[in-house]
Amino acid sequence: MILYSFAKINLSLHLLGKRPDGYHEIETLMQTVDLADKITMTECKEGTTVTCSDPIVPSDERNLAYKAIDLIRSNYRITKPGIQVHIDKQIPVASGLAGGSGNAAMTLHGLNKIWSLGLSREQLMALAAKLGSDVPYCLFGGTARASGHGEKVKWF
């Protein structure tokens, strides 16, 4: 399966203060742009493998796509089959364009289809919120307003 995770920009960003959990309370307007990482997902016999065309990107538990796989496996008790994910990186690393968040979001979408999980939009959003502030938005992209620490998303 091939999926594309698109970069996003913040058209506006208001920091409203720091929360007790360490996150910042925000209000932001986000938009996807025409720059994307290509995510290739393939079932295999067992295990989890994440690779990336950019050697700077970790291929272990520090990678958000890897964390998305672990989250799905633990929440739905999936041990087999295995999954291989390759990220062809086009979005610059650590650029603030949500590259890693988008990779995690598309990994959630891909696993939902490959493993026939039948997860609803709401279930995907709840899982995404556990992975990072931009991941819920990156599930569906487009133009949206986000608040909280980014987990509350309303699309236009």
Residue ranges and their predicted role:
Residues 73-84, 108-127:
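Phosphate-handling active-site elements
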Residues 51-59, 89-98:
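A short glycine/serine-rich beta->alpha loop
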Residues 12, 42, 51-53, 84-88, ...:
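Solvent-exposed beta-strand sheet faces enriched in polar/charged residues
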Residues 1-53:
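N-terminal, positively charged, Ser/Thr/Ala/Gly-biased leader segments
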